[in-house]
Amino acid sequence: MKITRNQFLKLIPAAALTLTGCGSKAQPANTESLVFSHHYKLDYAQQFTADCYEGGYTMLTIAESDARFLVVPEDAAEVDGLPADVTVLRQPVENIYLVSTSVMDLLLHLDALDSVAFSGTKAEGWYLPAVQQAMEEGKIAYAGKYSAPDYEQILAAGCRLAIENTMILHTPEVKEQLEHFGIPVLVERSSYESDPLARMEWIKLYGILLGREEQAEQVFSAQETAVQPILSQEPTGKSCAFFSLTTNNLATVRKGSDYVARMIAVSYTHLRAHET
């Protein structure tokens, strides 16, 4: 007998799928089970922090929402006495439902495409050939956009994490439903970083999540080094105006503090948009 989506959802025991919420102020966890070691060094990123604890535990805190995620090594002991707002992510973090498209390129640089099971974008919507191929080969499945995920498909595959961007905040009921089903939701904020290197530094967050910190630091260091020759050049004295056209043929200009404006500023040109 076929059942409807609503009937399917009602069959899932809510008690087994309950997930603690997020919302406390960003502080290193103060429990008897966790011993604080040090703050993970970030040179540019302002939208997340990482606190390291003895035993390989790492607490990730996302700015604004103050959502906290404790990354626990695969064979590490359970942690007792955690604050109620902390979401535990035990490694390996796999079968990810990836909605935030900007994250995919970072995962590719970490050789972590196999950690993604579901995409919020169809194959034809990707500009990354490796992702298109993975979807065409059935290694990554389309599971619906951010506002309409295929809950049955995601649950059946044992999804361990949904990575969303702030668009999900327009449909909070979807985030709540995913969390109700026991799927942690990480709302990444890399797009709120004003510095290009700060955006790139988010690769360290995914390195921590996936147990690839060293690789993430190597990738970031290489990109930072590649930018240095540009930063050491003298200003060109040239001016630049940047705009784009929407699908409605309207011209839009970025703010002077915008990420794109900052990229142009890094190249030492003067922005016409600076005064807007």
What is each model feature region?
Residues 5-9:
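N-terminal export leaders
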Residues 22-104, 215-241:
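Bacterial Sec-exported substrate-binding components of ABC uptake systems
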Residues 95, 152, 156-251:
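Extracytoplasmic substrate-binding proteins
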